[in-house]
Amino acid sequence: MPVAGPLEIVSLDNEARGVGRLSNEDGTPGKVVFVEGALPGERVTYRSHRAKPSYEQATLVDILRQSASRVTPQCRFFGTCGGCSMQHLDSRAQIAIKQRVLEDDLWHLAKLRPDVVFRPIAGPDWGYRYRARLTVRHVAAKGGVLVGFHERKSSYVADMTSCEVLPPHVSALLVPLRELVGRLSIVQRMPQIEVAVGQDVTALVLRILEPLTSADEAELRAFADRHAVQFWLQPKGPDTVYPFYPLDRALTYTLPEFGITMPFKPTDFTQVNHQINRVLMSRALKLLDARPGDRLLDLFCGIGNFTLPMATRGCEVMGIEGSEALTTRALANAQHNGLDGKTTFACRNLFEVSADDIAALGRFDRWLVDPPREGALAVSKAVAELSQRGGEAAALLPGRIVYVSCNPATLARDAGLLVHEAGYRLAGAGVVNMFPHTSHVESIAVFERA
């Protein structure tokens, strides 16, 4: 299509595309145009590659007026690699935009404004990604094996030899991993490498669709010794993961403020950003405002990431998780840290929980809720139903709920139920910049019983 414009960019969408609006001939608002690479405040020309009746998708051609927040991307693969979408935007502006997304979703989806907007939780902009899922593909046209993230909006693998958001020692492994996979007999049968960086160990989980030969195994052992990594193998589903070499190392991360060491498997859900996780932990416990002797409930507890720090404050804590394997590991982690006397764990499907299920747990003074992207709809509906029953049922509800979210849209949906139907107020909310240079919005919110 021909070059069009000029166009004023007024905002970013949830994929970090610049958003502008055309005007009809009569001066009324027309189509919305989404422009890859454009920033709010910029005046640009663009070329559309997809046109629909109500919107167009386009690529940036020229910047006629540049945003003061535009910066030079640090990574030379930015724009091709799909791992990041906002490196061309100043870090402070990234956080401000994420805060605006959170507040807009709360207002537009739930008609809510927090009483207090919390100061954003932020940390290092680079080298923060301690977990990553890398795609592996043999591409003859590229001269061999590629290991990396997908290209932006594509199933192709980016031809990348470094990554600025991975820890430097992991970034340095990208080229050696290409060479390693190229030497294996199953070069065409290894679609993925999952990276998990612990306190002292870097684990690489190889998804293998065929057994390794003895020569393959020798290659892996030599690579592990040379690069100080630990290989795990995954022949089928996530439950089939097992350590291959070396066997005398354990993956852990630490929470120094609480004196806690957390063993984990490389396929367990753990936070990508260890530094932010520690700050988030402190903020969450401060917002819970629990007192020694309080009973606390941790929903979607995983391996005990929040449960165990809560228990160090002299509280009795119950963690509930939908995965039997994670529930078992949470209990083991409590025992490892000498907190099994302060914690109990149960496995429940929290996506199908009812008001009666919640009531059967008994009363807890404070709740912490940390769901996946789907949010906590069933839990929120159960809370609303107990509130509406009144009497003893309503008395079971906590005075405060701290909600950690990785999807502002589902947070807003659940917040609407908690406030408009369950009698809570949204006391505060703010963003957590867990994923710098991406459009991913993590946040924390506090609800207090009115």
From Swiss-Prot:
Keyword terms, alphabetized: 4Fe-4S, Iron, Iron-sulfur, Metal-binding, Methyltransferase, rRNA processing, S-adenosyl-L-methionine, Transferase
The protein's organism comes out as: Ralstonia nicotianae (strain ATCC BAA-1114 / GMI1000) (Ralstonia solanacearum)
* NCBIfam families, per database record: PRK13168.1
A biological process (GO) of this protein is: rRNA base methylation
Reactions catalysed, semicolon-separated, are: uridine(1939) in 23S rRNA + S-adenosyl-L-methionine = 5-methyluridine(1939) in 23S rRNA + S-adenosyl-L-homocysteine + H(+)
Residues involved in S-adenosyl-L-methionine binding: Q271, F300, N305, E321, N349, D370
**What is the protein's given name?**
23S rRNA (uracil(1939)-C(5))-methyltransferase RlmD
InterPro entries named among the record's database cross-references: 23S_rRNA_MeTrfase_RlmD, MeTrfase_TrmA_CS, NA-bd_OB-fold, SAM-dependent_MTases_sf, TRAM_dom, U5_MeTrfase_fam
Per the record, the similarity remark reads: Belongs to the class I-like SAM-binding methyltransferase superfamily. RNA M5U methyltransferase family. RlmD subfamily.
The entry marks the following residues as binding [4Fe-4S] cluster, namely C75, C81, C84, C163
Q: Which gene encodes it?
A: rlmD
At the top of the EC hierarchy, this enzyme's class is transferase
The record, for Pfam families, names: TRAM (PF01938), tRNA_U5-meth_tr (PF05958)
What EC identifiers does the entry list? 2.1.1.190
The entry lists its GO molecular-function terms as: 4 iron, 4 sulfur cluster binding; iron ion binding; RNA binding; rRNA (uridine-C5-)-methyltransferase activity
The job of this chain, per UniProt, is described as: Catalyzes the formation of 5-methyl-uridine at position 1939 (m5U1939) in 23S rRNA.
